[in-house]
Amino acid sequence: MKNINPTQTSAWQALQNHFDAMKEVTLAELFAKDADRFGKFSATFNDQMLVDYSKNRITEETLSKLLDLAKETDLAGAIKSMFSGEKINRTEDRAVLHVALRNRSNTPILVDGKDVMPEVNAVLEKMKKFSEAIISGEWKGYTGKPITDVVNIGIGGSDLGPFMVTEALRPYKNHLNMHFVSNVDGTHIAEVLKKVNPESTLFLVASKTFTTQETMTNAHSARDWFLKTAGDEKHVAKHFAALSTNAKAVGEFGIDTANMFEFWDWVGGRYSLWSAIGLSIILSVGYDNFVELLSGAHEMDKHFSTTPFEKNLPVLLALIGIWYNNFFGAETEAILPYDQYMHRFAAYFQQGNMESNGKYVDRNGNAVDYQTGPIIWGEPGTNGQHAFYQLIHQGTKLVPCDFIAPAITHNPLSDHHQKLLSNFFAQTEALAFGKSRDVVEQEFRDQGKDPAQLENVVPFKVFEGNRPTNSILLREITPFSLGALIALYEHKIFTQGAILNIFTFDQWGVELGKQLANRILPELGDNKEIASHDSSTNGLINRYKAWRG
């Protein structure tokens, strides 16, 4: 994987010049010039997904220059490096192989000369057997009752991915009730424990090291709660399993290491739902549906690693994102799923993107002088329309948006889905083409009103348009199509990081706060006044101590 400053390439300079010619061009003009624009700037994946990127402020020349940037920064080499098991996470000396976790072809993938696939398959088989015992009721709790509730205790990648997927795939869920606890705020675990019975609850403790502060604090609280009823510590083994690699700590906790599911240092947390961290997904929707999820992602992996860039969906979406981020100065991207089951999708890729590409140091260790990762946010439609779309339509900030929707709903109630999709289609049209002053005035005339008398209102009803969007239409949200969609975004993020010359797979930015919290925690153990920090931190700690009593 080469270290190339993108701004020093001839392609970047060409894009800068091209931007000067494009910045005033409107989407209305682009569509008026080309009746086949949709045909040229859209593509279908596996007859399951349509990606329409025609409502972007791009031309064929724009894409050509962006593709030149991908070539000049050796994106092809970066993709090959990742898929071949090279240690592209150099700051932690690790390979990056979430693609191996869903490698349904089972072709060998080597790390340090060793094929990782036998171990991947062994853990999958172990999860299959365990999940089947739980789901079937064969596995019994300490009083002989089958498991009814599963509580996943994890944080970050050990929580966001499994929670997002189990919510997205709720139509496929079985009888088990799923709960997720992440926050070290005791309220989170306390509220979940109110809902479950210790005799029929299984806790999954998801921590690679089995030392993560938030996760282990919650796990010990769950264990204490359980033992208040169960009494004997030997019963812990019937009600707790671990997603970890620290067999010693797992055993000391009281978990049978036969119920410890391993993953490897080449699995990054925010790319780990495909690993043992996905056990909660299997328990929710069954092993076969989990395999379908893996299969959908694997198909997207094949597309990403083998398709020429000009037809490569993750690459195209990544390049369009760079176009807005680095040339138009757009600071954010909104992810807007028109499906209530997908309500955690934006939050998941908020971590996926911002923890991956929120870096100001390049792969050479130098501070960058260009923009890297964007701010990611979003909510499901149509809720967002009644909240923040006002700013997207008429605000002063450029917010490129991804609209996502299924053609087929899992809940065909009355005409709900047609109304939902009519909004989906209308919003991208409105954002692209807006409403001119002439149209506003004509609407007033059609209502029998005199535009001249309404001069003070007309400007506020004008929509400039020219707001860019991608539309991703899925045939239906299934385990397969969801797997493909997640992998699409994963590879988009990797592509942008590769081109922008940053390390996408470390996350040193989360460390400093943790270090300082560990330093401050002992200071909160008494009521002595603190003077060891800056005046603000001292003031906050001392007021906290005064108020807590």
Curated annotation (Swiss-Prot):
SUPFAM superfamilies to which the protein is assigned, alphabetical: SIS domain (SSF53697)
GO cellular component: cytosol
GO MF annotation terms: carbohydrate derivative binding; glucose-6-phosphate isomerase activity; monosaccharide binding
Pathway given in the UniProt record: Carbohydrate biosynthesis; gluconeogenesis; Carbohydrate degradation; glycolysis; D-glyceraldehyde 3-phosphate and glycerone phosphate from D-glucose: step 2/4
Active site, per annotation: E355 (proton donor), H386, K514
InterPro entries for the chain: G6P_Isomerase, G6P_Isomerase_C, Phosphoglucose_isomerase_CS, SIS_dom_sf, SIS_PGI_1, SIS_PGI_2
One BP term from GO: glucose 6-phosphate metabolic process
Cell compartments where the protein resides: Cytoplasm
Organism: Cronobacter sakazakii (strain ATCC BAA-894) (Enterobacter sakazakii)
Pfam families hit by this protein: PGI (PF00342)
Source taxon at top rank: Bacteria
Catalytic activity: alpha-D-glucose 6-phosphate = beta-D-fructose 6-phosphate
PROSITE patterns: P_GLUCOSE_ISOMERASE_1 (PS00765), P_GLUCOSE_ISOMERASE_2 (PS00174), P_GLUCOSE_ISOMERASE_3 (PS51463)
EC number: 5.3.1.9
Similarity field: Belongs to the GPI family.
Protein's UniProt name: Glucose-6-phosphate isomerase
Chief location category: cytoplasm
Lineage: Bacteria, Pseudomonadati, Pseudomonadota, Gammaproteobacteria, Enterobacterales
Known role: Catalyzes the reversible isomerization of glucose-6-phosphate to fructose-6-phosphate.
UniProtKB keywords: Cytoplasm, Gluconeogenesis, Glycolysis, Isomerase
Keyword Cytoplasm: yes
